[in-house]
Regions:
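Glycine-rich phosphate/pyrophosphate-binding beta-alpha loops
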Residues: 18-21, 83-88, 92-95, 140-155
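A conserved helix-loop-beta module that forms one wall/lid of the active-site cleft
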Residues: 1-23
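Phosphate-binding site of ATP-dependent enzymes
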Residues: 28, 34-90, 96-109, 126-127, ...
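A short catalytic or substrate-binding loop motif that flags glycine-/basic-rich loops and adjacent residues
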Residues: 17-18, 57-60, 71, 116-119
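Peripheral (often C-terminal) accessory segments that flank ATP-dependent C-N-forming ligase machineries
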Residues: 163-256
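Flexible, glycine/charged-enriched surface loops at secondary-structure junctions
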Residues: 53, 118-122, 171-179
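Feature representing long, continuous alpha-helical segments
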Residues: 106, 137, 155, 159-160
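Conserved metal-phosphate-binding beta-hairpin within the catalytic cores
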Residues: 113-148
Length: 256
């Protein structure tokens, strides 16, 4: 509370239950932060007894350490670094690369070990290249939006989860192989939405720069062996956009 009263610091206010970047607002400390919290409680009809979580804003790249545990036993682990995100304020990544970071991985495993975790989880971190410092952000206890990257890099979490459940954790662990490093995956439709968001913010040149210098090894939603995924996803977003007049709408129940 003492640090949050410092008006020179920047903070992130996050609803306790949100959807990607929805339910997240940025603010200076002190009176500005208090006003932001009051505004979130009113706008999202939150319970004042469960106000948004306040975290100090941290600069740096977004990383994720994804794991499968079985009653406290680690079965598989995979690390990726975010290169682009759907909207400027954060949220789902549209471009990311398989990578490794020993410090983050050790911290993630230490936390899940202590919790005797069971099931899937992705732990998010921020890493500041200038200082080498990394900071833990949150745990997502579910399958994650960038699951295609782990599959493309050789870590099939759904299959390993199935094996752990049907044949036991030892069998699942025997099928795990460390990920190939440097594999890049792009969410094609999400990248289009990202460009629309940039254009909406007046960054037209960036929005229209299609050659970003990154070669994708895989696309989340464009597969030769399953081509209807892209069409189905496109139809879903088009219908939602026509209904809500937004490509990233806030719908009932998303933030609470």
């Amino acid at each position: 509370a003492g640090r949050a009263s410092d008006a020179s610091r920047e903070y992130v206010a996050r609803a306790r239950r949100g959807n990607s970047s929805k339910g997240v607002r940025f603010s200076r400390g002190g009176d500005a932060l208090a006003k932001t919290l009051d505004g979130m409680i009113e706008d999202f009809e939150l319970d004042p007894a469960s106000p948004p979580i306040v975290q100090e804003r941290v600069a740096g790249d977004g990383w994720g350490v994804s794991c499968l545990y079985w009653h406290g036993q680690r079965i598989a682990s995979f690390t990726h670094r975010r290169l682009q995100e759907k909207v400027a304020t954060g949220g789902t990544s549209t471009l990311r690369v398989s990578d490794a970071h020993a410090g983050m991985e050790a911290d993630a495993h230490r936390l899940l070990d202590a919790l005797e975790w069971h099931g899937l989880a992705m732990l998010e971190f921020k890493h500041d290249p200038a200082t080498g410092r990394h900071v833990f952000i949150e745990v997502n206890p579910r399958l994650w939006g960038s699951i295609d990257l782990s599959l493309s890099a050789g870590v099939n979490f759904p299959w390993l989860l199935y094996l752990a459940h049907t044949r036991g954790p030892a069998v699942a662990q025997a099928h795990f192989q460390p990920a190939r490093q440097g594999v890049v995956a792009r969410w094609l439709l999400g990248d289009m939405i990202r460009r629309l968001d940039l254009a909406r913010r007046g960054q037209f040149r960036t929005a229209l720069t299609f050659a970003d210098g990154v070669h994708a090894d895989s696309f989340d939603d464009a597969k030769w062996d399953d081509p209807l995924v892209l069409f189905g996803e496109g139809f879903y977003y088009l219908a939602k956009g026509l209904r809500t007049h937004s490509m990233n709408p806030l719908e009932a129940g998303m933030v609470r």
